[in-house]
């Protein structure tokens, strides 16, 4: 099975009764009842077209893309601080 890269998006709705309709656009990961938004995952290739389709619906307030694929996860300076390293050896 080939895995494709997915990207998340937060879709803010006017009412949650329309949340079930979003299942045809991707995988619905989470639905917030209090803040009325849906976290939706879809393929990276179809993100722009899906976003345009979602924004055209009358029940969608806003669509925001997740920036997680663009955030750097490898850090340059990964050495621990000398003072903290000494405290760990002491057992504090």
UniProtKB/Swiss-Prot annotation:
InterPro entries reported for this sequence: DUF2129
Assigned GO CC terms: cytoplasm
Keyword Cytoplasm in record: yes
Statement: the UniProt record of this protein carries the keyword Cytoplasm: yes
Keywords assigned by UniProt, alphabetized: Cytoplasm
Domain of life of the native organism: Bacteria
Subcellular location: Cytoplasm
Pfam families in the record: DUF2129
HAMAP family assigned to the protein according to its UniProt record, in alphabetical order: UPF0298
Protein family: Belongs to the UPF0298 family.
Name by which UniProt lists this protein: UPF0298 protein BH2594
